[in-house]
């Protein structure tokens, strides 16, 4: 999705509120006749040809700074008052009535503010209209003031507009709301909401769940078991949880949907906690360590950490990475995450653009000293020579070779050669990582001939290198892995999955040299998948019929026979693949293969054949699922009325007997799992809760000797 910066409107009015000037501000420099601002101009003000200025009011400015900017924009040297027909700006009334300097009022009720524009005017990212008038032309002469414009603001704006047309504002956004309120929506209020959803023709999923000692009551169209006595959960059309309430508090993820559903309910809300975290994925990488060259405290505040910025009011934090930006805000402001991303991308272009000179000597020479360095008896740093030897043979337009020497000539005519006094590192090669990232051919000296490598072919023969080539440098586990990277597994799984496998590295680093097969972590193809909760993990594992590793836990799907060959692993909530990599010593290419999933599958506590738990009237509950007339039932259930199900009382003796085994169970609801287990035992024994303890214990010891205290075959 490409973010479009909305135009802004400045209206300068005279003594009788007649419009003297209408200024249409846009960084694009042209009028957008489809914008809401132009519609307002044309329809409500009857202005079809406003003044078009390639300008932009920064929404991060304080009101005092905005006044200085507007005085400069309009070339006014007198005291002015600014206001808006949509929001209060500098002045407001205690009852939040919209302030207008031409309307008589009791002046003692006025409150003056110097807040930040995006806070005072919440819709400013999409629709900003500011009215300006000379205070002497109003009945409120004493409320006017004159502010000098901050020259740094104008300097920043000029820089911004200079680079604007080159900015890549393509972005994808994930949002995570953390809004928790105390509410008066008790059982009756929740019933009203579920009734409204059931009566409406929507794609929303919902469930109202009530339970006590004797009954479980459910209504809705998304039947799942919860562990709360009262719970209303509503999922949006994308199957994401919109909001959930236990009757005392409510967690809201989809503010718009919740507002629609309670519009005719007298809902009282008291905020307990609230913030929104946006993760913005960028189309073009940025420099994560931003350093500002001019005073920009009116936009962002720098911190001691190079990749973290704060908003000017220090209430919004911005964490920068190469390919994404995380923005955390306290209160929901429409499209503020897109606007702040625009500012970050602009600042990155203005002050932190990557130098792309192809002449290695003109780039940072620190590359040579750190990456292609001379250490002890290793002379890997190439030297610059002034001419070619007579006996040299031309290999390509930029590469010459003799029996004792090789010379590479870059695009600027600089000649590099490897002359090792020890006679070892005399073969010219190139650092593949820099070629992949920036198409830079940086020479380095190697022990063996490098002509077989893809990077050599690209730099010497101008052949394209596939973007899918994997870097031979293996990262430590814990970092999110990009498409061209791989990382080690966690230590415990690295030892387990790679037992007996061999891998060799270049001396003194983690650059893969050779392996006939080794398990590592790789990014998944396609869209990024995030699993934030245990519920998400369980749903993913069962939907994909796959194995997933999260922390030190291995998750298996319910049905052993449906398990596929893939193994996934969670890194910072993002799903990655476990793959087997192979590399030959004389090749750069790293090949990936399916992992040896049998190693993990053998750990599965498998039920080798389907067992019927209960059967009646053509309905059959088995270890493989629920069947009706022999066909697996997988349709969504829906209920527009209240249904009652008896709650079951279980035997404490059975749960205590298996308690040593239960401590190894990992599930979303352990109590529910234990209760289900105990019910199945009771059904097998055809017993009730009143059976004597001596009888039940003896039968358990006879049929279930392996209950966790010791392992028996």
Swiss-Prot record:
The keyword DNA-binding applies. One of its GO terms (biological process) is positive regulation of DNA-templated transcription. GO terms for molecular function: DNA binding. Keywords: Activator, DNA-binding, Transcription, Transcription regulation. It comes from the Viruses. Signal peptide: none annotated. InterPro entries: Poxvirus_early-TF_lsu. Pfam families: Pox_VERT_large. Belongs to the poxviridae VETF large subunit family. Heterodimer of a 70 kDa and a 82 kDa subunit. Part of the early transcription complex composed of ETF, RAP94, and the DNA-directed RNA polymerase. Acts with RNA polymerase to initiate transcription from early gene promoters. Is recruited by the RPO-associated protein of 94 kDa (RAP94) to form the early transcription complex, which also contains the core RNA polymerase. ETF heterodimer binds to early gene promoters. This is Early transcription factor 82 kDa subunit. It comes from Yaba monkey tumor virus (strain VR587).
